Amino acid sequence: MKVTAVLMVAVLVLTACQLTTANTTDYVRRILARKSTMSKRYCSDSGGWCGLDPELCCNSSCFVLCG
C-alpha cells in the first residue's frame, strides 16, 4: 500500500514537471520568434499610426499615434 502511494506521488510529480517544462519551452519559442520578426518590422514615424501596439513606434511611446 505504501509503495503504491509513493509511486502515485512520483508519477504526479514527474507529470507536473513535464507540463511546466513544456509550457516554458513553448513560451520561449514564441518570444524568440517574435523577436526575430520584430527586427524586420517597420517602425512608424513620429505622429504615425500605431494603434495600441507600442512596438510599432520602436523607440517612442504609442497611444494611437507615435509620440
UniProtKB/Swiss-Prot annotation:
One of its GO terms (molecular function) is toxin activity. Residues 1-22 form the signal peptide. Pfam families: Conotoxin. The keyword Secreted applies. Expressed by the venom duct. Its main location: secreted. Keywords: Amidation, Disulfide bond, Knottin, Neurotoxin, Secreted, Signal, Toxin. Residues 23-39 form a propeptide. InterPro entries: Conotoxin (IPR004214). GO terms for cellular component: extracellular region. Disulfide bonds join 43-58, 50-62, 57-66. The keyword Disulfide bond applies. The modification Cysteine amide is found at residue 66. It is found in: Secreted. The presence of a 'disulfide through disulfide knot' structurally defines this protein as a knottin. Belongs to the conotoxin O1 superfamily. This is Conotoxin Cl6.8. It comes from Californiconus californicus (California cone). The lineage of its organism: Eukaryota, Metazoa, Spiralia, Lophotrochozoa, Mollusca.
